[in-house]
Curated annotation (Swiss-Prot):
Gene name of the encoded protein: ZNF74
UniProt key word DNA-binding: yes
Protein name: Zinc finger protein 74
Presence of keyword Membrane: no
Transmembrane segments: none
Residue intervals of the KRAB domain: 43-114
UniProt-listed SMART domains: KRAB, ZnF_C2H2
Species name: Homo sapiens
Tissue: Highly expressed in the fetal brain.
MF annotations from Gene Ontology: DNA-binding transcription factor activity, RNA polymerase II-specific; RNA binding; RNA polymerase II cis-regulatory region sequence-specific DNA binding; zinc ion binding
Localisation: Nucleus
Alphabetized CDD domains for the sequence: KRAB_A-box
Zinc fingers (C2H2-type) by residue: 248-270, 276-298, 304-326, 332-354, 360-382, 388-410, 416-438, 444-466, 472-494, 500-522, 528-550, 556-578
Amino acid sequence: MEIPAPEPEKTALSSQDPALSLKENLEDISGWGLPEARSKESVSFKDVAVDFTQEEWGQLDSPQRALYRDVMLENYQNLLALGPPLHKPDVISHLERGEEPWSMQREVPRGPCPEWELKAVPSQQQGICKEEPAQEPIMERPLGGAQAWGRQAGALQRSQAAPWAPAPAMVWDVPVEEFPLRCPLFAQQRVPEGGPLLDTRKNVQATEGRTKAPARLCAGENASTPSEPEKFPQVRRQRGAGAGEGEFVCGECGKAFRQSSSLTLHRRWHSREKAYKCDECGKAFTWSTNLLEHRRIHTGEKPFFCGECGKAFSCHSSLNVHQRIHTGERPYKCSACEKAFSCSSLLSMHLRVHTGEKPYRCGECGKAFNQRTHLTRHHRIHTGEKPYQCGSCGKAFTCHSSLTVHEKIHSGDKPFKCSDCEKAFNSRSRLTLHQRTHTGEKPFKCADCGKGFSCHAYLLVHRRIHSGEKPFKCNECGKAFSSHAYLIVHRRIHTGEKPFDCSQCWKAFSCHSSLIVHQRIHTGEKPYKCSECGRAFSQNHCLIKHQKIHSGEKSFKCEKCGEMFNWSSHLTEHQRLHSEGKPLAIQFNKHLLSTYYVPGSLLGAGDAGLRDVDPIDALDVAKLLCVVPPRAGRNFSLGSKPRN
């Protein structure tokens, strides 16, 4: 395998803007490790590695750190493909353990840079590699700036090596004018603008036929010849380049890169190339590091532990996100609503709420979602899959979060407590929903009628009133409902199930809301009060009916005669007058009959012809007699309303 060497200008970091230099350096290493047809040289892991100090590491954000980790590990895997290493680099060990790479950097003395010697090299020896015992795995890579090797050049050698300095793996004959020199010992240091330069004039022997010029070596920077700045056009171009400039442009998205290898790496995201495949399940990944993390799912390995609660994770990035729960840190803020998030992926998903973007579409029904997990969960409606099963009762669920909430029913755990009324809940979402009863907040508005709701699910059910959609059908009787909850309650009519028992009188109910209303009989609670007269009611619909007395509203109209009624039950009774087709004199309003008729009074009149009539149904008795005996002196004719 062949990988391109970083271009010479990439090895020199600008000291004018440390943050920009770090970003550029990090972007550049993402291009290493891809093939290009150039001349070759041997390369060790150090040649494709970039280290950071603790201060520099702190300037990188999470995506940049993740990119650094992915590229470093992938480059190491590429080196391994050519043969087993003598030892694993420390930075790789730290990255695999999820540790920060700056923590392993050794201290480097701040003394004078070890001397370098430039010697004349015969033309026939140019470009010849002088091998020394290698201490790291090496491989062939194309060399940037190949044209330099065809010219008269000097040889770069270390004349004196400090006892604590690591031995280099390779030594090359380098053209002094064309290739900036770099001290490998101080490669990781950063020297500010105007930093001290070390004069190495005594170690420079001019090449025959060239003007002598002192080479000045900056600690941690590249050697250059100040008297001949034009000898380093590549460095000058790199430092003078703007932040948005680039030579290689992506045809898909227009993003520009300084190296063609960086562009090749970027194209993976468009092509979705997944070269790394799991042997267990066959799932493929774009990066080798993603495959390593995925394998921990099969092995169950969770090497990263939270120091606060002891929770373990298979991925270090997951641990970092988790630790923000303890610290309360939320560094990712939405510019539209100022809502903050602990993870950049959560912010990306949240932004789709504002944009309305729903990129994930169901192939079965065409429904679209703004999150892939929502689409995966939706697919289970079509397949009927419920992979998450409760170990206590065996009940299965389509998503893991529902199982987690359900398990708290068995454990009795209710960790989320309302600060207003001290009521506790087993999930944060239910607490949030409950708190809106105190604040009166109804953030979800219907676009058709403007009605507000405290929960998005309630709004979805309400919208079906306007659309007439009833997607939930009973298999027993074929009746359809707009909500799945209504269907569940309806099914109990067929099964006779009444799972909600009153603890006071042991009366059972098929739905929980009916139990709550019933319990108000025992407690005497009447939470719904009329603002006009102060009368209180135990149920909200009773208050709504009562308020029509004050407003005079009659919203129910008879289609036959146009008469208006304030209650739907009154309209239903009125419509019987039209449907039965009998004389008005023998039609009786069931409500009025039950109000003015005293059961048993007809049979008590001594009429022998009516002794076999069942006295339970007062309406049938009245139809037979066509007479309603008055109460205590009240007289009114048949078919007329009683006088007040």
